[in-house]
Structure formats: structure tokens, C-alpha cells
């Protein structure tokens, strides 16, 4: 089994959300379901110095995240029907025909990848554009990015090319589920577990 994964360049990303919208359009998703989400992590403050001048250490950067098709997915472990599973090609997918919509997978996933579709009455999620990949194409989010901040390939190739870093705030540490994700950190990036910043767009994600 050749495991695929995503690469994300946080230095290039401007938070335009083209990847998110391309996914919604391609998958015909409703307003309440987002398979790919853009997180804005921001922080810092202004401090007045003794001479009256102001000094700032404000920072902000974006993270584009979908399902990471983890090596040790938490979502599959809690699914009572086996609907959420990792297929032979390494993609974590949901069998919508047997999913009962209990949302345990959503509660277990540290990346909020499984999404409940109220119209369908069961869970849905990013499938890595499995059909496109099988035909030799990239996922729609990767092809849509105008800054080429996303890539998708066998994870061993991505790690050889870009490194292994993926524990970037506001994401959780990688040892929880071993995500098949590589991140090129923004110059302002903080490591997972950082408390100096906060999520700047909580209602969007």
C-alpha cells in the first residue's frame, strides 16, 4: 500500500480560501460542511516603552487543513459500524450507506475532518479526491490553489522533498494520530501546544 499525503506551504498561503471553495463546489457541499478549512492563527501585542514609543510583536499566519488520512486515525477506532475506515490505498473514507450519524468520529478526530451532513443524516469527509488520484490527477484543492501552496503525493516522496514538520499551531502534536501531512512553517509559526496565539476565525472553521 502506497500511502498518500498532503503538503502545505504556510509561507505561500494568503488565506484566500480558493482551495476550500473549490472543494465545496466539486463535492457539492452545503454551507455547513467544509472538507477543507483555513485556520488563521494570530497573536502578539503592542507595548508602550518608557520613551513613549510603541513596540509590537504581532503575528498571523494561515493553515489549510483537511483530512490527513492518518497512519493511526482516531476516527476509525470509535466508529461503531465500521463505516469510517482506511481503505487499501491508505485513504480514510466513510461508507455513507452504513453510517448512522452518531458523530463519534467527529468528536475523536483532532483535525475535525469528519463532517456531519444534516441533509444526508450521516457523516461525510474529505476522501482525498480518491477518484481523481486514481486517474492520475491531484485533489481539486491542490489544483485550485493560485499560490501553489498545496501538494499531494506519496507521503514518503513529500517527506524526502520537504521534511517531516507538521506539528504547527493550532494543529495538535503529530504523535496523536500520525497524520500524513508535511507543513512548511510560516516564519511566524508557533509549534503545536503554543498558547501565545489564538484562532482568529473560529466561526469560519
Swiss-Prot record:
[4Fe-4S] cluster 4 binds at residues 79, 99, 102, 105. [4Fe-4S] cluster 1 binds at residues 13, 16, 19, 145. SUPFAM superfamilies: 4Fe-4S ferredoxins. Binds 4 [4Fe-4S] clusters. InterPro entries: 4Fe4S_Fe-S-bd, 4Fe4S_Fe_S_CS, DMSO_DmsB, ET_IronSulfur_Cluster-Binding. [4Fe-4S] cluster 3 binds at residues 67, 70, 75, 109. It holds the Pfam family Fer4_2. Keywords: 4Fe-4S, Electron transport, Iron, Iron-sulfur, Metal-binding, Repeat, Transport. Disulfide bonds: none annotated. Its cofactor is [4Fe-4S] cluster. Residues 4-32, 57-89, 90-119 form the 4Fe-4S ferredoxin-type domain. [4Fe-4S] cluster 2 binds at residues 23, 126, 129, 141. Changing residue 60 to G: In strain: Eagan. The keyword Electron transport applies. It comes from the Bacteria. GO terms for molecular function: 4 iron, 4 sulfur cluster binding; metal ion binding. NCBIfam families: DMSO_dmsB. Electron transfer subunit of the terminal reductase during anaerobic growth on various sulfoxide and N-oxide compounds. Heterotrimeric enzyme composed of a catalytic heterodimer (DmsAB) and a membrane anchor protein (DmsC). This is Anaerobic dimethyl sulfoxide reductase chain B. The gene is dmsB.
